[in-house]
Amino acid sequence: MAHKKGASSSRNGRDSNAQRLGVKRFGGQFVKAGEIIVRQRGTHFHPGELVGRGKDDTLFALSAGHVQFGHRRGRRVVNVVEQVAAPAA
């Protein structure tokens, strides 16, 4: 392999695409079942009540409700709180 630059060659010109990670639905926002709440690498956030975890550590809602962030045993957890239907009068 040549270690000197040949005519009109360059060592630059490569860049990877962004992974678009992060929180997609914030605390208090309404989500439907299956909606992605957090895209992450590793378990920065852990799944709580009514939240599932995909094989790439993505957190998603298992049921419709409002997103709630909190702590449990020193871990940051994401919960989905179901809406309680108002009693019919």
Curated annotation (Swiss-Prot):
One of its GO terms (molecular function) is structural constituent of ribosome. It comes from Frankia alni (strain DSM 45986 / CECT 9034 / ACN14a). PANTHER family: LARGE RIBOSOMAL SUBUNIT PROTEIN BL27M, RIBOSOMAL PROTEIN L27. Keywords: Ribonucleoprotein, Ribosomal protein. This is Large ribosomal subunit protein bL27. PROSITE patterns: RIBOSOMAL_L27. The gene is rpmA. Residues 1-21 are annotated as: Disordered. Belongs to the bacterial ribosomal protein bL27 family. It holds the Pfam family Ribosomal_L27. GO terms for biological process: translation. The keyword Manganese does not apply. Disulfide bonds: none annotated. Residues 7-19 have a biased composition (Polar residues). One of its GO terms (cellular component) is cytosolic large ribosomal subunit.
